[in-house]
């Protein structure tokens, strides 16, 4: 049986080496996030201040995988 993962939204607060980021979730938890392979292959830039969707394992709630970068509402893309 496949493990159930929780999906949260959060804000990137700090960029760390090797594609790791410090993410503050909407429930004020601070976790370590790494970039998923699909985002890495698509060359999507993630910077501090970006809002992201992050997938957190139910076994280890201190680490998660960044699966989506949300668009900013105030940008003129």
Swiss-Prot record:
Swiss-Prot/TrEMBL keywords: Chloroplast, Initiation factor, Plastid, Protein biosynthesis, RNA-binding, rRNA-binding
The UniProt record lists the keyword Plastid: yes
InterPro entries: NA-bd_OB-fold, RNA-binding_domain_S1_IF1, S1_domain, TIF_IF1
Function according to Swiss-Prot or TrEMBL: One of the essential components for the initiation of protein synthesis. Stabilizes the binding of IF-2 and IF-3 on the 30S subunit to which N-formylmethionyl-tRNA(fMet) subsequently binds. Helps modulate mRNA selection, yielding the 30S pre-initiation complex (PIC). Upon addition of the 50S ribosomal subunit IF-1, IF-2 and IF-3 are released leaving the mature 70S translation initiation complex.
Taxonomic source organism: Drimys granadensis
All copies of domain S1-like, residue ranges: 1-71
Protein's UniProt keywords contain rRNA-binding: yes
MF terms in GO: ribosome binding; rRNA binding; translation initiation factor activity
Cell location: Plastid, Chloroplast
UniProt-listed NCBIfam families: infA
Full protein name: Translation initiation factor IF-1, chloroplastic
Self-association state and partner proteins as the record states: Component of the 30S ribosomal translation pre-initiation complex which assembles on the 30S ribosome in the order IF-2 and IF-3, IF-1 and N-formylmethionyl-tRNA(fMet); mRNA recruitment can occur at any time during PIC assembly.
